[in-house]
Amino acid sequence: GLASAQDTQVVKIGHVAPMSGGQAHYGKDNANGVAMAIEDLNAQNVVIGGKKIKFEMVGEDDAADPKQGTAVAQKLCDAKVSGVVGHLNSGTTIPASKVYNDCGIPHITGAATNPNLTKPGYKTTYRIIANDNALGAGLAFYAADALKLKNVAVIDDRTAYGQGVAEVFKKTAEAKGIKIVDQQFTTDKATDFMAILTAIKAKNPDAIFYGGMDAQAGAMLRQMDQLGMSNVKMFGGDGICTAEIIKIASGAKALGGVVCAEGGASLAKMPGGTAWKAKYDAKYPGQFQVYSPYTYDATFVLVDAMKRANSTDPKVYTAKLPEANYKGVTTTIAFEPTGELKNPAITLYSYKDGKKTALN
């Protein structure tokens, strides 16, 4: 029905990701996904509980820092948002999830992949992408079965994400008969990897698995070239599986040996992927990274639960999230009792002629 202007209710949806620092390119892409969803929702003139709803995004920057992550989560609780899309990093999402649970606001991440996120069993925590158990294992199977690799070195950045995905890869690879010849550690701020790469080179591995993000992986690829290691493959999870790594690696030969995994189908195989991407690129040229289709879907999943509950009150509509069966851009989204996505897909990619290309 035609709800009159005074019957319009503003409903705020929070978004959190690093909007500053070395991971801001992911954060911007995620924020774009939510902004685009909100624009599309507002064009639909959604009516819930007899009121015309105007959705607004409240964006916060967690700078990929766990302390800042919990602080902005509390800020969103205080701002009375109806739901949150975020965060990007497992290291910020896991502590923030407790804050959202305590204040009774549901959050959906389309990016944080550490399996521990859903362990506490909060009724407010949901993930709409494959977790690291799927990513790390998928990469190890490919290394062993398709590439028949024998010796692999492992490096991780000691974050919840990097350490987690590296551990799963290592466990699965060892079970498949791959020898882990060296294990080294770095940080998510490091730029110089010459010492650890030199140590690894002495062990003569077929590949390096890197648990971490693209800024470090790209610099590592350049330094591998300098050390005459451009024939050593680099494996990694979704954190390195970006368009940005091509720029960061700036012509490194070693980029040709990268194999990375992402949760979900490739854009071309997503139900609404191709049309959605064209629309995104028209709005935000050159900003696409990885997760914006997921943050777009996450926004719609929250609103879909509000519609089914006929309420925008988190205390009321959160109970409808477990029954989600939402046909999104990325896939049809339904949840396990834990809040994990049902039937998650993963896709492996390589970089052919400087372009990110799906392997399967």
Go through each PLM region and give its residues.
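Extracytosolic ligand-binding ectodomains
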Residues: 5-360
